[in-house]
Amino acid sequence: MPRPSVVVPYLPERIGRLHEIATNLFWSWDRDARSLFRILDRPLWHLTRHNPLEQLRRTAPERLAECARDTHFLRLYDGVVASLDRQATNADTWYAKEYPALANRPVAYFCAEFGLHNSVPIYSGGLGVLAGD
């Protein structure tokens, strides 16, 4: 059964790319990106089991507006956005160096036997990391 897309009811323009960060697994290995969501609402971050989309959906518009004015949050946010952009366009990667002719032909590998993160439910009926779900 397909899952409904997560709608974030309100996101101030100044931090509008939070949704983009939340939908890119980049946040799961980038410490500063995870810190953004932790700062946004630490109890909710834990309650949602570190699911940034669910957290954005459940965060009060007033809290989002407050973060959009907070200089510490904005400095961290701007750094995360810059890192995300660098990673998306950086030609200085192993793949780009080893396979320059394939730079514009990305590769995706999907296997339902591996769990990416608990916020990305993949159910295959197999054992492994998903067996506890």
Predicted ranges, named:
Residues M1-D133:
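Catalytic cores of glycan-processing enzymes that make or break glycosidic bonds
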